Amino acid sequence: MAGARGIYGLSGSGIDVESLVKVGMMSEQKKYDRIYKKEVETEWRKEAFADVYSEVNAFRSNMSDMRLSSKTKPMTATSSLSDAVTATANANAGVMSHTVEVTQAASNAYLMTTSGQKVARTNTAAPTSVALKDVAFAGGTMPAGMTSTDTALSFKLSNGTGTTEIKFTAEEVFTKNLTLNDLATRINNARFIGSDGKKSALNITASYDTVSDAFSIVNTQSGTNNKVSLSMDTGASSATYTTALLNNLKLGQVSGGTISAPLSFTISGTTAKLEAAGTNASVKVDGRTYTNLQDNKLQVNGVTYTFKKATPVGTPAQVTIAQDQEKLVENVKKFVEDYNKLLDDLHGRYNNNKYPDYGVLTKEQEAGMSREQVDKWNERAKAGLLYRNDYVRSIISDMRDAVTNRVGSAPGRYNNLASIGITSKDQSGHLKLDETKLRNAIAAEPDAVKQIFSHTDEDDNYSDNGVATRLSERLGKRMESLKSHAGMTADKSDRSELGKLIQEYEKQMSDFKKLMSSFENQLYKKYNAMEEAISRLSTQFGFFSRQ
């Protein structure tokens, strides 16, 4: 017989060595399997806790949102002239109408090839070329005396705060044939060094439109302080060609939906400059004038206005602020749904008992089953992993406590969930919503939901905190405990208690495997010696039988 540790049975002893070794190893294999089953079950339990952590975390995130006034007191803002002014309102805004006059909206510094014109070319032989050499240089050729390393084009670009240089060498212009698109790219990538020594974006963008043969440069920020300024040293060797380039772009200033004639360079000493600035907004809200607004936004008493253009003279916009009751009811409904969903899941895990006849399968047992059979078995074997678990029980208890108790900081009769139509409908703590009662409460006290849900006490007094605040803070603490015990994921290397336990079981299995291998070798040696002894006896018996 061929064995795993040698060849046996040649003596004719009839001993089944393999079977004897296997029987001898059975008790050791059972010991190993007990550790293996503990390790697998701990992995499953860790995975179950990871699911709980994820679900609680998602709900807690929703509770953090529910603390926001935009959730507990959403407001609407409607403008009678939405093409001129729009608005949004937060919970601090009063339910009322506002009169808004826009004298002038803020605008950006904006240069563009003048309407009805196209980019001109100094090289008249190439009237549609986009190459810089044809736009700025006669004949599209390098001037005499200029070398490839010389600066062919150069100007300063400023946004009113920072300045940088845009330049091209003769090699880039005449050998690499850079184009108007490359000019736009170089402007878009421009940076300047600020007073802090760090590079900052100019917030100036440029583009070339091949269809209309037009070039544009715009400062992305509005207001008079934000400019587009192009300047150069008139004494520089590249000044003549740079002037030709910028003049040929035919840049006019865009303002109020119209575009001016091409701007000209103004000369001051040795500097030539072409510049456009944005405009500030000037508005009047409820009779109060606001001037020199750098952008088109203004917040007054919880209302944020956005200005688009001037309102007609004598016809101001009416901006009406109202509470968004439908949105508020929708938010409360979602809270109830989210709460019940999490509570149902936790109750399911807490009350789900084990199947006593289903445990972790050994590798040998799995080998004798189909994949489908193993999956079905494991589905039942995983039941009850968190049955009557203290961590789950604590979360359920905190959730129910948070929604049941009165909010001490809420004035008047609307001071708990029941007062606005949210009550427990059964022993499980499942919530139900009386929508009519909720709407009546909102109508009677617009701040009712906000007071009950989102209040955060300065002294962190639990009884004075709102429901969403209580849930967020209590669940946060429970999540820290879960994290310490089981981690946030199924990863065993997270240094959680269960993660460390899994690693300890794995070490025990590894060490026990070595002991089993040693014990198995001892068994083979034992039966090998037995075979040899029987062989010697057989030889002696044969000798005496022949006498």
What is the predicted function of each stretch?
Residues 127-143, 147, 151, 173-185, ...:
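Short, structural beta-strand-to-alpha-helix junction motif
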Residues 1-57, 61-63, 81-106, 149-159, ...:
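Polar, low-complexity export/assembly segments characteristic of proteins
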Residues 112-124:
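Short Gly/aromatic-enriched secondary-structure transition segments
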Residues 164-179, 329:
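Short, contiguous acidic and Ser/Thr-rich linear segments
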Residues 124-129, 174-181, 239, 255, ...:
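Short, amphipathic alpha-helical segments
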